[in-house]
Amino acid sequence: MLFEAILFDCDGVLVDSEHITNRALHTMLNASGWAISEAECLQIFIGKTVRSETARIERETGQPLTDAWMAAFYALRDQGLHAHLQAIPGAVAAVQQCHALLGGKIAVASGADKAKVLMQLDKVGLLPLFDPHIFSGHDLPRTKPFPDVYLAAAAALGVEPTRCAVVEDTVTGVTAGVVAGATVFGYSPGGPEHATPQALRAAGATQVF
């Protein structure tokens, strides 16, 4: 099948950010009274928004998840990203090739907040290749695992979702792409930041690399 567009997740696919974000979240949760390990934190939150686990956070910390708390988390997270973020090895070259082959019909469809996505793409030099086709689940009624962000990206490119390829590294993201009707390719280079090939295939990924 020849695809007319490719839709990329951002964190863990284009940029190596998951461990940085997880470290900041772990620090915040520990300071709030939840004695969770970094490994447990990653397992619970990878591929999800923090607010999607509001009930659990409030139960474990005994305090409300306020806008001020989220702002402090974002500040700590962004400080780490500005200092340490790098592109996934080979991602920049791959995106450049896809952009050339598809006449620019590529997009980012992320579950993260758009400010974070824009900052990360800019830092690793990918922003000009994707702009303005950068989409966040935070800006839509539902985020991943619902398909909204992928449907929005496909619509903006003028391509039917069934003619799109999606690249994802989490079960949540693969599920979103599959429900959107796209063909999903899983990325699983190993390590705790990425789902296993078996998990990605079980969620509906056609191939895993």
Task: Describe the function of each predicted region.
Residues 2-10, 14-100:
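N-terminal helical cap/lid subdomain that shapes the substrate entry/recognition surface
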Residues 9, 13, 110, 169:
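Conserved G/P- and acidic residue-centered "switch" motifs that form tight phosphate/ATP-binding loops
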